[in-house]
A protein has these predicted regions:
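Glycine-rich ATP-lid/hinge loop adjacent to the conserved G-boxes
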Residues: 59-68
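Short helix-loop "hinge" at the ATP-lid/N-box region of the Bergerat-fold HATPase_c
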Residues: 13-14
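Short beta-strand/loop element within the Bergerat-fold HATPase_c
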Residues: 20-33
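Short alpha-helical Gxxx[C/S/T] motif in the catalytic ATP-binding
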Residues: 72, 76
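Acidic ATP/Mg2+-coordinating residue in the GHKL
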Residues: 41
Length: 105
């Protein structure tokens, strides 16, 4: 299920990136013995007022032109939480988004 989450995050990052844009993926172990995996894009970003809502079932950011069901991030969060982890977002309009999955090592 964790592989599905990473695939979903990567797919989203590619779809929300500008043409010929790039996506960064990475992972590292933290000092407090967690593994953090992240997927970062450099697309239009997500308005901070939607940072919590994007993880709700069927939620789509208003004005989004990219096709989708509004389920991918909510299912991803559910899978990560089932492994006692967290899935968060860091994003600014015009600067892209970084989704961070944090799991106990």
């Amino acid at each position: 299920k964790i592989a599905w989450v990473l695939t979903n995050l990567l797919s989203n990052a590619i779809r929300y990136s500008p043409e010929n844009g790039h996506v960064v993926i990475g992972a590292h172990q933290t000092d407090d013995n967690y593994i953090e995996m992240y997927v970062q894009d450099f697309g239009k970003g997500i308005d901070p007022r939607y940072h919590k809502s994007i993880f709700d079932h069927y939620f789509r950011v208003p004005g989004t032109k990219v096709q989708g069901s509004g389920l991918g991030l909510s299912i991803s969060r559910d899978f990560v939480e089932a492994h006692n982890g967290t899935l968060t977002v860091q994003s600014e309009l015009g600067r892209g988004s970084k989704f961070i999955m944090r799991l106990k090592a």
